[in-house]
């Protein structure tokens, strides 16, 4: 169990580190018009840290509940797809300065969280519930993304 927790912690930290390294929030972002309900910049780091920590815990619970290697492979594939989609959004929005492209990508990220919940629920109901904040935050971020696109389009 200690190895599983260590691996999950490493993956969460790697995702956080990669996301931070690939995100450059600069003058361009600060110049965008944003809705009055846009959270302050400092909220996003702690929010994602908690959400990805919960996702890591969900992965550990599901991994421990998995009865065989095939189930663990399925868990790993679901998380791998989610990680790729999670890491894709920030460069689209911030580095390429294309919130419109990020808006096209975000439904796939949201669906990958749904797939995680559906895939983990039969193994561990608590694991599935630990992913609920992730799903809600991505839905909120998608609506914020949509609003920013509407307030600032066109891009590119």
What residues fall within each predicted segment?
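Terminal transmembrane helical module of multi-pass membrane proteins
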Residues: 121-156
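Membrane-interface loop-to-helix entry segments
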Residues: 39-54, 98-109
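Hydrophobic alpha-helical segments of small multi-pass membrane proteins
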Residues: 76-89, 103-116, 131-138
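Transmembrane alpha-helix/helix-exit interface in multi-pass inner-membrane proteins
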Residues: 17-24, 49, 61
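N-terminal signal-anchor transmembrane alpha helix
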Residues: 1-21
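Helix-adjacent hinge/juxtasegments
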Residues: 53-90
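Membrane-interface helix caps and helix-loop-helix hairpins in membrane proteins
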Residues: 68-69, 91-100, 121-125
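Cytosolic, membrane-interface loops and tails of multi-pass inner-membrane proteins
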Residues: 23-40, 149, 155
């Amino acid at each position: 169990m200690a190895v599983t927790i260590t691996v999950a912690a490493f993956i969460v930290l790697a995702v956080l580190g990669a996301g931070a390294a690939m995100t450059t929030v600069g003058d361009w972002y600060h110049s965008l018009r944003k809705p009055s309900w846009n959270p302050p910049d400092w909220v996003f780091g702690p929010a994602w840290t908690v959400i990805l920590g919960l996702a890591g815990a969900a992965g550990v619970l599901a991994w421990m509940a998995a009865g065989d290697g095939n189930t663990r492979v399925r868990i790993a594939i679901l998380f791998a797809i989610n990680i790729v989609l999670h890491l894709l959004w920030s460069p689209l929005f911030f580095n390429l300065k294309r919130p419109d492209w990020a808006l096209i990508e975000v439904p796939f990220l949201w669906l990958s969280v749904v797939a995680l919940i559906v895939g983990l629920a039969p193994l561990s109901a608590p694991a599935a519930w630990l992913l609920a904040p992730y799903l809600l935050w991505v839905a909120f971020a998608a609506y914020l993304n949509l609003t920013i696109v509407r307030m600032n389009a066109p891009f590119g």
